[in-house]
Curated annotation (Swiss-Prot):
It is found in: Mitochondrion outer membrane. It comes from Saccharomyces cerevisiae (strain ATCC 204508 / S288c) (Baker's yeast). Component of the TOM (translocase of outer membrane) receptor complex responsible for the recognition and translocation of cytosolically synthesized mitochondrial preproteins. TOM7 is involved in assembly and stability of the TOM complex. Forms part of the preprotein translocase complex of the outer mitochondrial membrane (TOM complex) which consists of at least 7 different proteins (TOM5, TOM6, TOM7, TOM20, TOM22, TOM40 and TOM70). One of its GO terms (biological process) is protein import into mitochondrial matrix. InterPro entries: Tom7. It comes from the Eukaryota. The keyword Membrane applies. Pfam families: Tom7 (PF08038). Belongs to the Tom7 family. GO terms for cellular component: mitochondrial outer membrane; mitochondrial outer membrane translocase complex; mitochondrion. Residues 42-60 are mitochondrial intermembrane. This is Mitochondrial import receptor subunit TOM7.
Amino acid sequence: MSFLPSFILSDESKERISKILTLTHNVAHYGWIPFVLYLGWAHTSNRPNFLNLLSPLPSV
């Protein structure tokens, strides 16, 4: 397996890569449903006001 390049990373680089991967995992995990809801809201013909969507009171 001498044809595969070997990357020698410092401990600091490994820690940064680990933090970046953890951050992207959290963004994808917690941002998926709001993203899908936004896409559904953005592509409707009768788009309600965004503040009305966040209000717990029914809109008139």
